[in-house]
Amino acid sequence: MHLPVAWSRRRPSSPRSRRISRPQAACLSGLTRKLARAIREGIRPDGSVIGPPMPIPLYRGLSDEDVMSMVIDLRQVPAVENDPGESRCDVPLPPSYSPPVESASAPDRGATVEYGAYLAGHMAHCIECHSPMGPQGPMTDTHTVASGFEFHGPWGTVISPNFSSAEDGVAEYSDEDVKAMITQGLRPDGERMSPPMPYANYARMAEEDLDAVIAYLRQLPPLPDGAGLE
């Protein structure tokens, strides 16, 4: 999937995460539906569109059950009164990210390629960060996990590595190596991986889910780093 907007190789500047905890005085009528719509369709309660880096094109495939689980968790977050200010997006945003999502389901859970694709795409959006950037956004359709996405932060500049089935990708690692990188942020040589790899968030992934993600990665076409992009 691609964002229907023009991207640069760097993220649009000044995106600010919005407060999503529940103030005591807030009206809860329709909150579940509004949160689900914001997550899966990128539409705020006031009708405005949420921009990058929120991976709406991938979240559109989240199952109804998984979206509801997220909403339930968010509604249990302690109340926080905070105004982060307005986000500023340097690219034009579409009026919407396509038609409303009426309903979506996930593949049956198991150590399968299909379920791994769901986890690596819609749930964890691994394929966004590990795919090179094109003019329409991360090239997740044609250059899936071929590396090349640049991240700029306090750590400097990090380029996401190749995780296709190429020899310089996932093929050179054992399943246990890949699991350690995903859940602990440790390379086979023991070196710590750089931010923004969110391994702390993946630390509690079930073994079966990790097996599914690895099965998915190993069947992807082998692509060179950056898939030959300049």
Question: Where in this protein do the model-derived segments appear?
Answer:
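The canonical Cys-X-X-Cys-His
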Residues: 1-2, 35, 70, 116-119, ...
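Periplasmic/extracellular electron-transfer cofactor-ligation site
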Residues: 1-15, 42-49, 77-81, 121-157, ...
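Electron-transfer interface patches adjacent to heme c in soluble/periplasmic c-type cytochromes
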Residues: 9-36, 57-67, 143-181, 199-210
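Short helix- or helix-capping micro-motifs
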Residues: 73-75
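Extended, well-folded interaction surfaces typified by the phenylalanyl-tRNA synthetase beta subunit core
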Residues: 82-92, 229
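Electrostatic cytochrome c docking/interface patches
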Residues: 94-121
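Sequence context surrounding c-type heme c attachment/ligation sites in exported
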Residues: 113-127, 140-145, 173-179, 194, ...
